[in-house]
Regions:
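Segments forming glycine/polar-rich beta-alpha architectures that bind adenosine-containing cofactors
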Residues: 19-52, 56-61, 65-68
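Secondary-structure capping and boundary motifs in well-ordered enzyme cores
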Residues: 52, 59-62, 104, 109, ...
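Iron-sulfur cluster-binding cysteine motifs and their immediate structural context
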Residues: 39-41, 65-84, 103, 113, ...
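Acidic catalytic cores of enzymes that act on phosphate-bearing nucleotides/polynucleotides
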Residues: 6-20
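Ferredoxin-type iron-sulfur electron-transfer modules in oxidoreductases and energy-metabolism complexes
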Residues: 33-52, 78-110, 139-151, 156, ...
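Short, small-residue-biased leader/transition segments that mark boundaries at the very start
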Residues: 3-4, 165-166
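A charged, amphipathic alpha-helical module
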Residues: 1-2, 35
Length: 166
């Protein structure tokens, strides 16, 4: 919407670039109450972490604990159809999904958003695998994972969990 574009392009990007002091007071006339439109944090890809988690497809037990504990939702599990997996980027490694019934037809991937990650390492600490499925690596070595994150966000929401819940 126009509200998002105006706020993100005219205010948020300048503030994030440390140029907020160049903004005229008139830039804030639509926000006199100090509010910001909901959802604009999706545009704040700051890349502030020194180190970010790297997922090891060969060590993951698919427990999703890393995703549960991430305070910034920067690491998330994804299920893919065979077709989606075939169309994934070459660096997009997947596993056969663990589980019963309908889940078995999917592929699994744990994906990190390197630009949203704050580098706290809580995900690594929470990993219960005997050999940790996540290790911290320098952000600059993982920037290519942003393409994988962007691909993950295009995946269909194909799984119905209603019959799997208690």
């Amino acid at each position: 919407s126009d509200v998002y574009k105006r706020q993100v392009n005219n205010i948020q990007k300048k503030i994030n670039a440390q140029m907020g002091n160049t903004l005229p007071v008139s830039a804030f006339k639509d926000y006199v109450d100090g509010s910001t439109p909901s959802g604009t944090s999706a545009y704040e890809k700051r890349g502030v972490a020194v180190d970010v988690p790297v997922w090891d497809v060969n060590k993951c037990i698919q427990c999703n604990q890393c995703s549960y504990v991430c305070p910034h939702a920067a690491i998330r599990p994804f299920l893919l159809t065979e077709e989606e997996a075939a169309n994934a980027p070459a660096s997009y490694a997947v596993l056969d999904a663990n589980g019963a019934g309908e889940i078995k037809q999917y592929k699994f991937r744990m994906q990190v958003d390197p630009l949203d990650c704050q580098g706290c390492g809580v995900c690594v600490t929470a990993c219960p695998a005997k050999e940790k499925a996540l290790v911290m690596q320098p952000l600059e070595t993982q920037l290519h994972e942003q393409d994988n994150w962007d691909f993950s966000l295009t995946l269909s929401d194909t799984v119905s969990y209603t019959h799997l819940t208690l």
